[in-house]
Amino acid sequence: MDAMRRMRILKQHLKTDRLLGVSAVPVGDAAATATMVQAEPQPGREAFSTASLPVMKRDQKIQALTQMDEQEVRGCTACVLCENRIQTVFGEGNPDASIMFIGEGPGQSEDEQGRPFVGRSGDLLDKQIQAMGFKRSDVYIANVVKCRPPNNRTPLADEVDACSGYLRRQIEIIRPKVIITLGGPAAKLVLGTAEGITRIRGTWHEYTAVNPPVPVMPTFHPAYLLRQYTKENRAKVWSDLQAAMERLGLGPRG
Protein backbone atom coordinates (compact mmCIF):
# COMPACT_ATOMS: atom_id res chain seq x y z
CA MET A 1 0.00 0.00 0.00
CA ASP A 2 1.51 3.36 -1.00
CA ALA A 3 2.21 6.15 1.44
CA MET A 4 -0.49 8.48 0.09
CA ARG A 5 -3.21 5.87 0.55
CA ARG A 6 -1.95 5.07 4.08
CA MET A 7 -2.11 8.74 4.97
CA ARG A 8 -5.63 9.10 3.52
CA ILE A 9 -6.90 6.07 5.44
CA LEU A 10 -5.26 7.35 8.62
CA LYS A 11 -6.86 10.78 8.28
CA GLN A 12 -10.26 9.22 7.65
CA HIS A 13 -9.93 7.10 10.81
CA LEU A 14 -8.90 10.15 12.81
CA LYS A 15 -11.80 12.26 11.55
CA THR A 16 -14.24 9.60 12.64
CA ASP A 17 -12.55 9.30 16.03
CA ARG A 18 -12.86 13.05 16.60
CA LEU A 19 -16.54 13.00 15.63
CA LEU A 20 -17.07 10.21 18.15
CA GLY A 21 -15.21 12.09 20.88
CA VAL A 22 -12.14 9.83 20.99
CA SER A 23 -8.83 11.61 21.51
CA ALA A 24 -6.61 8.52 21.67
CA VAL A 25 -6.78 5.08 20.09
CA PRO A 26 -5.00 1.77 20.84
CA VAL A 27 -2.69 0.35 18.17
CA GLY A 28 -0.66 -2.79 17.81
CA ASP A 29 -1.13 -6.30 19.18
CA ALA A 30 -4.34 -6.45 21.19
CA ALA A 31 -2.83 -9.19 23.35
CA ALA A 32 -0.02 -6.89 24.45
CA THR A 33 -0.28 -3.76 26.55
CA ALA A 34 -2.04 -1.17 24.39
CA THR A 35 0.08 1.75 23.26
CA MET A 36 -1.91 4.96 23.26
CA VAL A 37 -1.26 7.54 20.56
CA GLN A 38 -2.84 10.95 20.28
CA ALA A 39 -5.35 11.37 17.46
CA GLU A 40 -2.99 13.23 15.12
CA PRO A 41 -1.72 11.95 11.74
CA GLN A 42 0.96 9.30 12.21
CA PRO A 43 2.20 8.02 8.81
CA GLY A 44 2.29 4.25 8.51
CA ARG A 45 -0.15 3.46 11.31
CA GLU A 46 -3.32 1.66 10.19
CA ALA A 47 -4.16 -0.82 12.96
CA PHE A 48 -6.94 1.16 14.61
CA SER A 49 -9.50 -0.51 16.85
CA THR A 50 -13.05 0.82 16.93
CA ALA A 51 -14.18 -1.52 19.71
CA SER A 52 -13.91 1.22 22.33
CA LEU A 53 -15.72 3.89 20.32
CA PRO A 54 -18.81 5.15 22.15
CA VAL A 55 -22.24 4.49 20.70
CA MET A 56 -23.48 7.77 19.26
CA LYS A 57 -26.89 9.23 19.94
CA ARG A 58 -29.17 9.90 16.97
CA ASP A 59 -28.48 13.62 16.81
CA GLN A 60 -24.74 12.96 17.00
CA LYS A 61 -24.99 10.51 14.12
CA ILE A 62 -26.91 13.01 12.02
CA GLN A 63 -24.31 15.68 12.76
CA ALA A 64 -21.41 13.36 11.94
CA LEU A 65 -22.94 12.15 8.67
CA THR A 66 -23.94 15.66 7.60
CA GLN A 67 -20.49 16.99 8.38
CA MET A 68 -18.80 14.23 6.39
CA ASP A 69 -21.10 14.85 3.43
CA GLU A 70 -20.96 18.64 3.37
CA GLN A 71 -17.33 19.20 4.40
CA GLU A 72 -15.62 16.24 2.74
CA VAL A 73 -17.58 14.25 0.17
CA ARG A 74 -19.17 17.11 -1.78
CA GLY A 75 -15.81 18.71 -2.43
CA CYS A 76 -13.84 15.49 -2.83
CA THR A 77 -11.32 15.39 -5.70
CA ALA A 78 -9.49 12.22 -4.63
CA CYS A 79 -10.12 10.41 -7.94
CA VAL A 80 -11.09 11.15 -11.53
CA LEU A 81 -14.80 10.54 -10.91
CA CYS A 82 -15.05 14.10 -9.61
CA GLU A 83 -14.36 15.48 -13.08
CA ASN A 84 -17.70 14.62 -14.69
CA ARG A 85 -20.14 14.38 -11.80
CA ILE A 86 -23.16 16.63 -11.51
CA GLN A 87 -23.20 16.10 -7.76
CA THR A 88 -22.10 13.57 -5.20
CA VAL A 89 -24.46 10.94 -3.84
CA PHE A 90 -23.62 10.46 -0.18
CA GLY A 91 -26.45 8.22 0.98
CA GLU A 92 -29.67 8.66 2.89
CA GLY A 93 -31.93 7.10 5.46
CA ASN A 94 -32.23 6.34 9.13
CA PRO A 95 -28.97 6.95 11.05
CA ASP A 96 -30.13 4.30 13.54
CA ALA A 97 -30.99 1.78 10.81
CA SER A 98 -30.63 -1.91 11.60
CA ILE A 99 -30.30 -2.65 7.86
CA MET A 100 -27.95 -0.88 5.46
CA PHE A 101 -28.23 -1.44 1.70
CA ILE A 102 -25.06 -0.84 -0.31
CA GLY A 103 -24.95 -0.56 -4.09
CA GLU A 104 -22.07 -0.11 -6.48
CA GLY A 105 -22.32 3.54 -7.48
CA PRO A 106 -24.69 6.27 -8.66
CA GLY A 107 -26.30 6.11 -12.09
CA GLN A 108 -27.50 8.98 -14.23
CA SER A 109 -30.70 9.63 -12.26
CA GLU A 110 -28.83 9.46 -8.96
CA ASP A 111 -26.18 11.85 -10.28
CA GLU A 112 -28.89 14.30 -11.30
CA GLN A 113 -30.89 14.08 -8.06
CA GLY A 114 -28.09 13.50 -5.55
CA ARG A 115 -29.97 10.54 -4.03
CA PRO A 116 -29.19 6.81 -4.10
CA PHE A 117 -31.43 4.33 -5.89
CA VAL A 118 -34.01 6.42 -7.69
CA GLY A 119 -35.72 5.60 -10.96
CA ARG A 120 -36.91 2.08 -11.81
CA SER A 121 -34.24 0.33 -9.72
CA GLY A 122 -35.12 2.53 -6.79
CA ASP A 123 -38.81 1.81 -7.19
CA LEU A 124 -38.14 -1.93 -7.07
CA LEU A 125 -35.85 -1.56 -4.06
CA ASP A 126 -38.56 0.44 -2.29
CA LYS A 127 -41.02 -2.40 -2.92
CA GLN A 128 -38.55 -4.94 -1.57
CA ILE A 129 -38.01 -2.85 1.54
CA GLN A 130 -41.77 -2.57 2.03
CA ALA A 131 -42.15 -6.34 1.61
CA MET A 132 -39.68 -6.74 4.48
CA GLY A 133 -41.98 -4.67 6.67
CA PHE A 134 -39.98 -1.43 6.52
CA LYS A 135 -40.26 1.97 4.91
CA ARG A 136 -37.40 3.45 2.93
CA SER A 137 -36.92 5.95 5.75
CA ASP A 138 -36.36 3.06 8.20
CA VAL A 139 -33.21 1.78 6.47
CA TYR A 140 -30.01 3.40 5.23
CA ILE A 141 -28.99 3.31 1.57
CA ALA A 142 -25.52 4.11 0.23
CA ASN A 143 -23.08 3.20 -2.52
CA VAL A 144 -19.47 2.06 -2.58
CA VAL A 145 -18.47 5.17 -4.56
CA LYS A 146 -20.13 8.54 -4.17
CA CYS A 147 -19.73 9.82 -7.76
CA ARG A 148 -21.13 8.34 -10.96
CA PRO A 149 -18.60 6.34 -13.01
CA PRO A 150 -18.69 7.27 -16.73
CA ASN A 151 -21.33 5.31 -18.65
CA ASN A 152 -22.23 3.54 -15.38
CA ARG A 153 -19.14 1.34 -15.62
CA THR A 154 -17.83 -0.61 -12.63
CA PRO A 155 -15.64 1.60 -10.40
CA LEU A 156 -11.89 1.11 -10.78
CA ALA A 157 -9.68 0.01 -7.89
CA ASP A 158 -8.26 3.48 -7.20
CA GLU A 159 -11.76 4.97 -7.25
CA VAL A 160 -12.94 2.42 -4.71
CA ASP A 161 -9.87 3.11 -2.57
CA ALA A 162 -10.58 6.84 -2.66
CA CYS A 163 -14.12 6.29 -1.35
CA SER A 164 -13.54 3.31 0.95
CA GLY A 165 -12.96 5.45 4.01
CA TYR A 166 -16.25 7.29 3.54
CA LEU A 167 -18.21 4.04 3.41
CA ARG A 168 -16.35 2.60 6.40
CA ARG A 169 -17.09 5.71 8.44
CA GLN A 170 -20.76 5.63 7.43
CA ILE A 171 -20.94 2.05 8.68
CA GLU A 172 -19.08 2.94 11.89
CA ILE A 173 -21.46 5.81 12.61
CA ILE A 174 -24.70 4.03 11.69
CA ARG A 175 -23.68 0.65 13.13
CA PRO A 176 -26.20 -1.45 11.19
CA LYS A 177 -26.87 -4.95 12.41
CA VAL A 178 -26.99 -6.28 8.84
CA ILE A 179 -25.62 -5.09 5.49
CA ILE A 180 -27.27 -6.14 2.24
CA THR A 181 -25.10 -5.61 -0.83
CA LEU A 182 -26.90 -5.14 -4.13
CA GLY A 183 -25.26 -6.72 -7.16
CA GLY A 184 -21.99 -8.45 -7.90
CA PRO A 185 -19.71 -5.39 -8.06
CA ALA A 186 -20.94 -4.07 -4.69
CA ALA A 187 -20.47 -7.48 -3.05
CA LYS A 188 -16.97 -7.83 -4.48
CA LEU A 189 -15.97 -4.33 -3.43
CA VAL A 190 -17.44 -4.53 0.08
CA LEU A 191 -16.20 -8.06 0.79
CA GLY A 192 -12.94 -7.90 -1.15
CA THR A 193 -13.74 -11.10 -3.02
CA ALA A 194 -13.38 -12.17 -6.64
CA GLU A 195 -16.33 -14.56 -6.42
CA GLY A 196 -19.36 -13.85 -8.58
CA ILE A 197 -22.73 -12.90 -7.15
CA THR A 198 -24.34 -16.20 -8.14
CA ARG A 199 -21.85 -18.05 -5.94
CA ILE A 200 -21.87 -15.81 -2.87
CA ARG A 201 -25.50 -14.68 -2.65
CA GLY A 202 -27.67 -16.52 -0.16
CA THR A 203 -24.80 -17.07 2.29
CA TRP A 204 -23.55 -14.91 5.15
CA HIS A 205 -20.27 -13.03 4.98
CA GLU A 206 -18.68 -10.25 7.06
CA TYR A 207 -17.56 -6.69 6.48
CA THR A 208 -14.38 -6.66 8.53
CA ALA A 209 -13.16 -3.08 8.02
CA VAL A 210 -14.99 -2.10 11.21
CA ASN A 211 -14.91 -3.60 14.67
CA PRO A 212 -17.02 -5.53 15.43
CA PRO A 213 -17.54 -6.91 11.90
CA VAL A 214 -20.99 -6.56 10.34
CA PRO A 215 -22.86 -9.55 8.82
CA VAL A 216 -23.30 -9.14 5.06
CA MET A 217 -25.90 -10.78 2.82
CA PRO A 218 -25.19 -10.30 -0.91
CA THR A 219 -28.12 -10.37 -3.33
CA PHE A 220 -28.93 -9.41 -6.90
CA HIS A 221 -29.12 -5.76 -7.91
CA PRO A 222 -32.63 -4.42 -8.61
CA ALA A 223 -31.50 -3.44 -12.13
CA TYR A 224 -30.51 -7.05 -12.83
CA LEU A 225 -33.81 -8.26 -11.49
CA LEU A 226 -35.64 -5.87 -13.81
CA ARG A 227 -33.74 -7.31 -16.77
CA GLN A 228 -34.11 -10.92 -15.64
CA TYR A 229 -37.51 -10.75 -13.98
CA THR A 230 -38.05 -14.48 -13.59
CA LYS A 231 -39.86 -16.29 -10.82
CA GLU A 232 -36.61 -18.04 -9.90
CA ASN A 233 -34.62 -14.82 -9.53
CA ARG A 234 -37.39 -13.12 -7.55
CA ALA A 235 -37.49 -16.13 -5.21
CA LYS A 236 -33.72 -15.96 -4.69
CA VAL A 237 -33.81 -12.28 -3.78
CA TRP A 238 -36.75 -12.77 -1.45
CA SER A 239 -34.90 -15.66 0.22
CA ASP A 240 -31.89 -13.38 0.78
CA LEU A 241 -34.06 -10.63 2.24
CA GLN A 242 -35.85 -13.11 4.51
CA ALA A 243 -32.48 -14.35 5.76
CA ALA A 244 -31.63 -10.78 6.76
CA MET A 245 -34.97 -10.43 8.53
CA GLU A 246 -34.43 -13.66 10.42
CA ARG A 247 -30.96 -12.46 11.40
CA LEU A 248 -32.65 -9.46 12.98
CA GLY A 249 -35.12 -11.70 14.78
CA LEU A 250 -38.07 -10.53 12.71
CA GLY A 251 -39.05 -13.92 11.33
CA PRO A 252 -40.08 -14.74 7.75
CA ARG A 253 -42.90 -12.95 5.96
CA GLY A 254 -45.21 -14.39 3.34
Language-model-detected regions and their locations in the chain:
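Charged, compositionally biased N-terminal leader segments and the immediate start
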Residues: 1-9
